[in-house]
């Protein structure tokens, strides 16, 4: 079993997706004075470290560094400055352990259902925190990036999606959304692209050199049930479990997206969770094509099988009480139990809908007239041909950043999902 995991992670950590390296345009380096790392920066980084965290191969834990006091802070500062001066990290910092964490979904017997977390040396993480703070002071990340940004979080992105749904419904306009999935984004991003992105956003060359030193000659060993595999090199991707990796990844997305973003910001990003928004199907097609081509040129890959499309419109899949509209089948006034046909937009009685039992939200329901006498869910609306390699599934609800977004708007579906999760804890 240990060798199976070793073979899986060795392949994942050393193979890039195919991409054209000629797309990396030459960028000017930002030369500046190399500022020494101060004890105040190191002390602030140590204070941010959590206690009782798993250690790397050396066995040094954060609790030891916190207990070392002023003498330990000075020693760590000297080591970090030596790395900056020499452009090389200690050999022990290059090694790590790889442990499995189940993603919470998928077949538990498949390797793809697990995320490999690297247990790095805690002294290295101190240097990463110092470098991260300095890089954040230099780069300007777009306001539509909510992942790993100060004073931003998942609730902000979810709030914006719901507000857009309400505004579009108020104006009787359709809102098209694409929830784009990036395949193995952190594990497969080429490191040449990372260095290019840092330089493109104006990061000082000495900082780029320090980050490159952190990734030079790195290796890891799989740790499973108290046993450790043979070591293997890691040549692709950013470190899962690293303090600096999230910032490096959003810098990559920021740098490559500047080439095809324009006009009003009609996209939301939370690290590798991307939502594209448009007023029409054609507009959404154009956005998906631009992002897909732009990211795949730089070594990232869009997982089209997991990318979903949602058409948000007023009354999508909802049962309403209204006597103003005739039933699309029998022409009598509709009542409480009615549903809108997604094809002809007529309201249909429950008894004429062909649905047995209580009506449920279904944004792709079609009446018997539109289905040639066989009412049901529309085959046409379940998939939308976007001409980007394959058809994308059109859904009426989607779990985005832990919350449920429904095509009809509102938070009812999210509330039901939370109630179901709560009841599941008692089973």
Task: Kindly give the residue locations of the regions a language model identified.
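Surface-exposed loop/turn segments and immediately adjacent short secondary-structure elements
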Residues: 1-112, 118, 126, 399
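Conserved catalytic palm subdomain of right-hand nucleotidyl-transferase polymerases, strongest
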Residues: 52-60, 98, 109-119, 156-199
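Catalytic palm active-site di-aspartate
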Residues: 56, 95-98, 115, 145, ...
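Catalytic palm subdomain of template-directed nucleic-acid polymerases
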Residues: 66, 184-201, 274-298, 313-317, ...
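Active-site palm subdomain of RNA-directed nucleic acid polymerases
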Residues: 131-145, 221, 246-277, 335
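Short, conserved micro-motifs composed of acidic
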Residues: 302-322, 374-394
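Basic, alpha-helical interaction scaffolds
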Residues: 322, 384-427
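PHD-type zinc finger and closely related Cys/His-rich zinc-binding mini-domains in nuclear regulators
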Residues: 323-379
